[in-house]
Design a protein with these regions (language model features):
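Distinct, well-ordered alpha-helical segments
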Residues: 33-36, 60-75, 92-100
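Catalytic beta/alpha-barrel core
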Residues: 52-59, 80-88
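Mid-to-C-terminal alpha-helical segments outside catalytic/metal-binding sites
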Residues: 168-201
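Short acidic/histidine-rich active-site segments
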Residues: 141-163, 187
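Divalent metal-coordination and catalytic microenvironments
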Residues: 46, 106, 151, 187, ...
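Active-site glycine- and acidic-residue-rich loops that bind
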Residues: 83-93, 112-135
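Active-site gating/metal-coordination segments in enzymes
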Residues: 1-52, 105, 111
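Glycine-enriched alpha-helix->loop->beta-strand junction motifs that scaffold or abut catalytic
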Residues: 49-52, 72-79, 98-107, 144
Length: 201
């Protein structure tokens, strides 16, 4: 915890470069004791500094409430907590809405990823499934808690190596959202307002 607080500029002595986000804190489907220890330290550091937390969830599991319970116990503000990899649980409407009701951000960050995950025996949700789920979340009143991202984590995901690169959401997914009736004002909330809220309040 002390090291995290130092890196975030919350100690007396300051590092040359300040971190502005805690994470992505990794949680596996086994949710090991070491992972819980790391998560608790992140929660304490966030409580001490006000810096937001981003948590890697194993998307096909349902560990979001356990994660939020731990962060809450450590004093973290759930309104500055981002739960990553929410795409695979898109059809579990109750789960996602309950997490949003607790204040957390739901990050749909597997957009444009048409991968088969052998360890999960599961296919990534399609862009159409993602768009419909996001539209339903908006219709249910959760627009201010949705984040969009691509989770670019492989070399082959860069345009230079044949991937979608970093512009896929703007070039391809935003037009799809428009086709689902999402307005320009709503898109501004998703693309600009919500990222600001993660950091600002």
């Amino acid at each position: 915890t002390e090291r995290l607080i130092y890196d975030l500029g919350g100690a007396e002595e300051k590092p040359e470069v300040l971190a502005g986000l805690i994470g992505e804190i990794g949680i596996s489907s086994r949710f090991t004791p070491d992972e819980e220890k790391s998560l608790r330290a992140a929660g304490r550091a966030s409580a001490a500094t006000g810096v937001p937390i981003e948590v890697h969830l194993p998307g096909w599991e349902r560990l979001g409430h356990r994660v939020l319970d731990i962060l809450e116990q450590e004093g973290a503000n759930l309104r500055h907590t981002v739960l990553c990899h929410m795409n695979p649980s898109f059809a579990d409407k109750r789960y996602q809405r309950e997490l949003a009701q607790r204040g957390a951000f739901l990050e749909y960050d597997m957009i444009g990823m048409s991968y088969y995950y052998a360890d999960e025996s599961a296919q990534s949700p399609s862009d159409e499934e993602n768009a419909r789920a996001i539209r339903e979340l908006i219709d249910d009143g959760y627009i201010q808690q949705i984040l969009l991202s691509q989770d670019v984590f492989l070399k082959t995901m860069l345009t230079r190596y044949g991937g979608h690169g970093y512009g896929y959401i703007l070039k391809h997914f935003v037009p799809r959202l428009r086709r689902h009736g999402i307005s320009g004002e709503q898109l501004e909330t998703l693309m600009i307002g919500n990222p600001q809220r993660v950091f600002g309040g």
